[in-house]
Swiss-Prot record:
CC annotations in GO: cytoplasm
Catalyzed reaction equations: Hydrolyzes single-stranded DNA or mismatched double-stranded DNA and polynucleotides, releasing free uracil
Active site: D64
Function per UniProt: Excises uracil residues from the DNA which can arise as a result of misincorporation of dUMP residues by DNA polymerase or due to deamination of cytosine.
Protein's GO biological process: base-excision repair, AP site formation via deaminated base removal
NCBIfam families associated with the record: PRK05254.1-1 (NF003588), PRK05254.1-2 (NF003589), PRK05254.1-4 (NF003591), PRK05254.1-5 (NF003592), ung (TIGR00628)
Name this protein carries in UniProt: Uracil-DNA glycosylase
Pfam families, sorted: UDG (PF03167)
PANTHER family assigned to the protein according to its UniProt record, in alphabetical order: URACIL-DNA GLYCOSYLASE (PTHR11264:SF0)
Length: 223
């Protein structure tokens, strides 16, 4: 069965045959059967489904999915419509307001970004309910490193937004032709130590315009 439905399939199909992925898959089947795991198994690869390889302009790298009920749906930092924005996302919206004057929306569903070429990728694609980082060591990093490496091989520059140490650890995979924006994580624990005031959204758009590309419309409308 073909797991990925767009141009990511050609780039990543060999990964699904690798021994590490077979082990990861077995582990996940058991986990989904016996525990509460987020996101829903049909949403695991949504970041890749919502934003095709060819369309990627910006990557926002997260850590692992939200681990509360009804939050995670496969896009980093995003929550399903109708679910209150978690604290990190509230801080992202505050910075977006101060950076570009965008109104803070009444929800945290970031599909509009994904549809414009913002790949919202977590480094681990699943998590146990209530246990942050619980799937960090089961093989996802190997898979998501391949995703980052595939983008890095593009001559066409991509903006990589790396918030926090986990995301910044991936910098070594990213080629020098790409534009990297770094700061501390938007979590309430660190946002005041350099996330607020870092202006990642205007920096990303300025770079895209300098490359002759359409900037991202970061404003999320109310629903």
């Amino acid at each position: 069965m073909q797991i990925l439905k767009n141009d990511w399939h050609e780039l990543l199909k060999d990964e699904f045959e690798q021994e590490y992925y077979q082990q990861l898959r077995k582990h996940l089947i058991q986990e989904y059967r016996t525990r509460t795991i987020y996101p829903d198994m049909y949403d695991i690869f949504n970041a890749l489904h919502f934003t095709s390889y060819q369309d990627v302009k910006v990557v926002i790298l997260g850590q692992d999915p939200y681990h509360g009920p009804n939050q995670a749906h496969g896009l980093s930092f995003s929550v399903k419509p109708g679910v209150p924005a978690p604290p990190s996302l509230q801080n992202i919206f505050k910075e977006l307001q101060s950076d570009l004057g965008c109104r803070i929306p009444n929800h945290g569903y970031l599909k509009k970004w994904a549809e414009q070429g913002v790949l919202l990728l977590n480094t681990s694609l699943t998590v146990r309910a209530g246990q942050a980082n619980s799937h960090a060591q089961i093989g996802w990093h190997q898979f998501t490193d391949k995703v980052i490496a595939a983008l890095s091989q593009r001559q066409d520059p991509v903006v990589f937004i790396l918030w926090g140490k986990n995301a910044q650890a991936k910098q070594s995979i990213i080629g020098s032709q790409h534009f990297i924006i770094k700061s501390v994580h938007p979590s309430p624990l660190s946002a005041h130590a350099g996330f607020f005031g870092s202006k990642p959204f205007s920096k990303a758009n300025n770079f895209l315009v300098s490359q002759g590309k359409e900037p991202i419309d970061w404003q999320i409308e109310d629903i």
